[in-house]
Amino acid sequence: MSDLKAAALRALKLMDLTTLNDNDTDEAVIALCKNAKTAVGNTAAVCIYPRFVPIAKKTLREQGTPDVRIATVTNFPHGNDDIAIAVAETKAAVAYGADEVDVVFPYRALIAGNETVGFELVKQCKEACGDILLKVIIETGELKEEALIKKTSQICIEAGANFIKTSTGKVPVNATPEYARMMLEVIRDMGVAKTVGFKPAGGVRTAEDAQAYLAMADDILGGDWADNMHYRFGASSLLTNLLNTLEVTAETADPSAY
């Protein structure tokens, strides 16, 4: 197997296969769940809006892939600074049966100089999650500056985040290798590689992209770090490219381009 094929297979099993469109339907989510099961293995998770968690759970169970985890989003996509709403949404996501919650950090408040609200929001959402995995989206493309990206990553980790995630996929600039490096360096420098993972999201579209991101993680945190409890790709169109690289066809084409 070529290096690119090996990276493609590795990336496929680390994917949070995503649909977060305003016009999503039960049918779209069922199709997404079907795509999570491939001839070469399953994606790590599907990522969907909270209201679709029950239909996703039913579909994954019926197709014999209950090990595919269900991630959902809260405080999404704007990252508002109302802690009570973010916590209520997170509690609702848990009640729906989500295995993982991706919450948006109140990044605009941080840009304006308020570090406290973000820490409290993440801390209380993690308390609402209990053992459920909490990924925190910091919206790197809006923070832009290295100092802000590193500070936000640090706040999230100190507040109890299980993962730090680059982006919502809903702003002009989403995951970039430069931003990924900054966030991985925070995980390394804080000594939390055992307990904190990383998720680039939005803009990872090809096997070559995924290979470069994984090589960076291997370089910074070691070759055995990026397993599915420490690394995820938030993507949709990536899956088709990975399957093409592996010379496998998907059951249904995914028209989204997250």
Curated annotation (Swiss-Prot):
Reaction(s) catalysed (UniProt annotation): 2-deoxy-D-ribose 5-phosphate = D-glyceraldehyde 3-phosphate + acetaldehyde
Q: What is its EC number?
A: 4.1.2.4
Localization recorded for this chain is: Cytoplasm
| Active-site residues, record numbering mapped to chain | 102 (proton donor/acceptor), 165 (schiff-base intermediate with acetaldehyde), 199 (proton donor/acceptor)
Q: Which NCBIfam families has this protein been placed in?
A: deoC (TIGR00126)
The highest taxon in the source lineage is Bacteria
Q: Which HAMAP family match?
A: DeoC_type2 (MF_00592)
Q: Which Pfam families match?
A: DeoC
Q: Which GO terms describe its molecular function?
A: deoxyribose-phosphate aldolase activity
Main localization category? cytoplasm
| Catalytic class of the enzyme | lyase
- Record's keyword terms, sorted: Cytoplasm, Lyase, Schiff base
Which protein family is named in the record? Belongs to the DeoC/FbaB aldolase family. DeoC type 2 subfamily.
- Any one of the GO CC terms: cytoplasm
Question: Could you tell me what this protein is called?
Answer: Deoxyribose-phosphate aldolase
PANTHER family for the chain:
DEOXYRIBOSE-PHOSPHATE ALDOLASE
Q: Which SMART domains match?
A: DeoC
**Keyword Lyase applies:** yes
The pathway this protein participates in, as annotated, is:
Carbohydrate degradation; 2-deoxy-D-ribose 1-phosphate degradation; D-glyceraldehyde 3-phosphate and acetaldehyde from 2-deoxy-alpha-D-ribose 1-phosphate: step 2/2
Lyase as UniProt keyword: yes
GO BP, one example? Answer: carbohydrate catabolic process
Tell me, in a sentence or two, what this protein's role is.
Answer: Catalyzes a reversible aldol reaction between acetaldehyde and D-glyceraldehyde 3-phosphate to generate 2-deoxy-D-ribose 5-phosphate.
User: Which SUPFAM superfamilies has this protein been placed in?
Assistant: Aldolase
